Amino acid sequence: QGHAFWGPAVFCLAAAAAVFCMVRDDPHALGLEPFGKEAQESAQTRALHALHPTRLRWAMVQLAVLLVSGIGATGFTHLMTLYMAEGMDAMRAAAAFSLCGLALMAGKFACGALCDRLGSYRSNYLLFGCFILGYVLCTLAPLRSAALMLASAVFLGFGSSLNTVGISIWAADLSTQERYESVLRQFQAAYGLGGLVMSFLPGAIADLTGSYAPAYALFAALLAFSLFTLQSTYRLARK
């Protein structure tokens, strides 16, 4: 089984070397021109960039980022534990975990494309819907249904793209070009803190209730709160 880790390790080393050689802060550093051309901002985008939320509203937005990132990381890593604790076969649970990873990869590709095509506001509903549905399906783990397990893995993985790609998109939407780096740093700090704060919850709740499923129910509710917070902030720009 140890040999299974060699492939990902070699791939990560090769990818890191490629990124180090090719990625620069400025395309001109490699004698290149930026791909494409600057798009015209819509009235909605200009209104978002001009938005100046109150301190309370901004604190709620950062809390939403913290929750999304912490729940995304914690729910993903505990998925296999959830189903094995409910008596699912280890190999089936491992297959579901792998499927979740593939769905996450697909979600990262789709997230940006959806935001470009539909806009961030509508894309948030779609991606959060998948995310929340995945966690709701996880609460049904005690039923020991292989079909529900695989479905939960797909929806949870696809929606988990929000806690990586989504954060940079929200930072771009809710800032100006001058403030983008500052806002992104704040969101990244919330991202890191979320992983620390939320990581202990599944185990603690399982100790109290005898199951990991209630933790996923709590996570679904917190994601719904995060969706409400972000979308209500976006709607401020529509007034």
Which residues are covered by each model-predicted region?
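Flexible cytoplasmic inter-helical loops of multi-pass small-molecule transporters
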Residues: 24-47, 239
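Helix-to-loop junctions at the C-terminal end of transmembrane segments
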Residues: 108-119, 206-207
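Helix-loop-helix hairpin linking two adjacent transmembrane segments in secondary transporters
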Residues: 1-28
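Cytoplasmic membrane-interface "Motif A"-like loop-to-helix N-cap segments
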Residues: 117-128
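C-terminal ends and interior cores of transmembrane alpha-helices
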Residues: 130-143
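Intracellular juxtamembrane helix-capping segments at the cytosolic ends
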Residues: 162-175
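A late C-terminal transmembrane helix in Major Facilitator Superfamily
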Residues: 174-209
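Extracytoplasmic gate region of multi-pass secondary transporters
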Residues: 55-111, 198
